Amino acid sequence: FEYLKVDFTSNGMVQADSYYNKDVTTAVEAYNEGFSHFISEVDKGEPMFIALSIAPIFPYQYGNSRRIACDTWGKIGQSEYSLNAVSGGWWTNEFYQYNDPDHLVLVGNDADKETEGENRARITNGAVSGMVLVSDNYSLEDKSGRGDAKLSRERAQKILMNKDVNEMADFGRSARPVYGYREYNDKGDGAENCFVLDTEKYLYVSVVNYKDNQIAGKVALERLGLSPSSFSSVKELWSGDDVKVGKDGLSYTVPGKDAKIYRFLKK
C-alpha cells in the first residue's frame, strides 16, 4: 500500500484567539474541521495509509497509526524508550489500527554499530508494538555515506527473515505488559521488559534486556492466564529452540542488550 506520514499534528490542537472559520471557537473544533477536509481529499484517490506522528491521542479517527515514540534509532536505549510507550500506552491500539514504534533501524550512522542482539531487541520492539516499518540504507550502490549498506543487508538476512517473529508482527496488535507496574530499573521512569500477546492459537511472551549484563527471571503461568494443561509446547523464536516450561512458570535468561520471544502453542 501507499502511505502518508502526517507529522506534528499536535500543533493543530493548540488553542488560539481566533480561527479562519469564525464559527470555530476551540482547538478541537479546528482540528476536526481541518482533518475532516484533509481526509475527504485523500479519499478521492487510491487507498492511503495515514501515519500520524507527534499527534494527540484524541480525536483518533483520522489516522491508521499513531507514532508512540519519535526519532527512535537502533541502540538498546532507543528500544527501551519505545517500549516505555507500550508499557503505559498499549491500550491506544484499541482505537488506532496500529501503535507505531517508529522506523526500526538495524544499523545507524554511529561509528559504534548496533549489535545483533540490539537488532533482535529492536525488531522484537516492533512485533510487541504490532507494527514493523524497517528503515535502513540497503542500497547496492551507496554514495550517500549514511549508515552501512552492506552491513544492513547482512543483518536484514539474519534478523528480518525470521518467519515466526514476522508472523507475530503480522497480527498487528500491541502486546500488554505482563505486570503493569514493574519497570526494569525499579525507578518508575523506565519500560517494563516482559510483554504478553494472546492470540487464538498462540500466546507470546517477549522479554527484552535493556541492560549490559545478562538477566534471568521467571514468569508465573497464572500471570499469563495459563495453566500447565492449557498449552502443548513452547518455542523460543529467535533461536528456534524448544523450551520446557514447568508448573512454576516460564524461566528465562536473556543476554545483555538482547531479546527473546517465547511462543506457547495453546491446546
Task: Tell me what each language-model feature is.
Residues G117, I123-N185:
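Aromatic- and carboxylate-lined catalytic core of secreted/periplasmic carbohydrate-active enzymes
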Residues E29-G147:
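Glycan-recognition surfaces
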Residues G12-S18, P59-Y62, I215:
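Extracytoplasmic/secreted cell-surface and envelope-processing proteins
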Residues F1-D17:
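Active-site groove signature of glycoside hydrolases
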Residues E222-G240:
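Solvent-exposed beta-hairpin/edge-strand motifs
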Residues V245-K267:
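C-terminal beta-strand-rich structural cap/linker in extracellular carbohydrate-active enzymes
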Residues G126-S129, V134, E183-L226, K257:
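Carbohydrate-binding surface patches
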Residues G12-N32, F38:
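Aromatic- and acidic-residue-enriched carbohydrate-binding clefts of CAZyme catalytic domains
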